[in-house]
Amino acid sequence: MPAADPQRLLELINGCWTTQALCATVELGIADTLADQPMDAATLARCAGTDSQATARLLRALVSLGVCECHGTVYGLTANGRLLAAGPGPSLRGWATLAGRGLWAPWHGLADSVRTGLGHHARDGHDRFEALDGDAEAASAFQQAMSELTALIAGPVAAIIGGRLVGTGHIVDVGGGHGGLLAAVLASRPGWHGTVFDRPHARAGAERLLREEGLADRVAIISGNFFDGVPAGDVLLLKSVLHDWGDNCSALLLRRCADALSPRGMLLAVERLMPEAPSDLPAHRALCRSDLNMLIGPGGCERTEPEFRALFATAGLSIVAVTPSAAGFVVIEARP
């Protein structure tokens, strides 16, 4: 057994401080301001309307995190820091805000979730996603964060999905949010059209994204609850949906999808695979944290490949291929 490393453990314990520092950087507009022009702490404080000394202390912390760089007294963003600023290209600013605000309180209940096996939504009798329909601000923050995470993996995952599509057809993105992955798939498959199916709160964002991508005439947007049924299609796509839900709810959703598939249709689920024996690797740590995030929220989980195969079988679906992508996700192909 390796010797104890108290400093490493302290870094893990204090990880919550890092989350809040990054969230504050977005919330105060510091990343946006520095993206326009590097500047000293006093000038930045005037632009952001913050205290000069406190701003300097936050900037010092951001340098230590590799988010900012300092030359003399002038601070600027590193490449990672630019992911916290608004603008075109990859971004994680929405995720930083969601992690620091929307997910903060639920994580306080992790011990209770481990005691009971229930997420805080189940304990409170609330449906997390249904609640978003009545909270425009929370819904916008959630969908922005989800869109950012999807954009990071859309390229390699869409290439795999596109390779499964031949000729013409109809693909339904179930729980598709703003439709970013569907848009990436359809960009290289002009013979196909699609539908984004999600809760009502996602509709406006989907309309905007599809219009910007020039796909408004090829993609319909339908609002609803996928546990009640899903639109019919030749291909049904589920990206990071099954991990939200426990086995009973996931099996019901898969049965709804199986019922909606056209003859000889297929279901494609984009998920990450939990390793049989996780270790102290960055990818494993990220996946295990996500697994706990699902536990404390809607009650879902990350699954191993055998667990996915058993789950799909309960819905009358057979997994015929599991294709890894360069983005760390796999594309699970299943058929009735």
Q: Language-model features: where?
A:
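Conserved Class I S-adenosyl-L-methionine-dependent methyltransferase catalytic core
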Residues: P6-E27, D32-T33, P38, C47, ...
